[in-house]
Amino acid sequence: MKTFSAKPQEVERKWYVIDAADKVLGRVAVEAANILRGKNKTIFTPHVDCGDFVIIVNADKVVLTGNKENAKIYTRFSGYVGGKQVDTPRKIRARRPELLLELAVKGMVPHTRLGRQQMTKLKVYAGASHPHEAQQPTAITL
């Protein structure tokens, strides 16, 4: 018996919606990353983008455990001298609440071209509504 390898044109994509209200950031991110990669499918192939679309709503209501809201640090560097920028989740949540979930999921997908392609299927919204009702997404409970 030969090992099955999925072909990109054979992959059937579905849409899923995750409600992140009062859920722990990492738990939501793990579930989203697994669906984006396609690890929940029997045809999972590591080098093929066989994942589905994921919509995360209520990203502004996601919870961080412990004192991470103030103590965790997100660092960026512009490339210029003195261009290091440090943010806490509290600052990021005030400016752009979707970014917390996007960064968490981004760290859980491969850091390659394939991972960047998989991240394009992630849609994160701060509120409870999203513009993807026409795709009839399936709700996932955590």
From Swiss-Prot:
Belongs to the universal ribosomal protein uL13 family. GO terms for cellular component: cytosolic large ribosomal subunit. Keywords: Ribonucleoprotein, Ribosomal protein. PROSITE patterns: RIBOSOMAL_L13. Part of the 50S ribosomal subunit. This protein is one of the early assembly proteins of the 50S ribosomal subunit, although it is not seen to bind rRNA by itself. It is important during the early stages of 50S assembly. It comes from the Bacteria. The keyword Ribonucleoprotein applies. CDD domains: Ribosomal_L13. This is Large ribosomal subunit protein uL13. One of its GO terms (molecular function) is mRNA binding. GO terms for biological process: negative regulation of translation; translation.
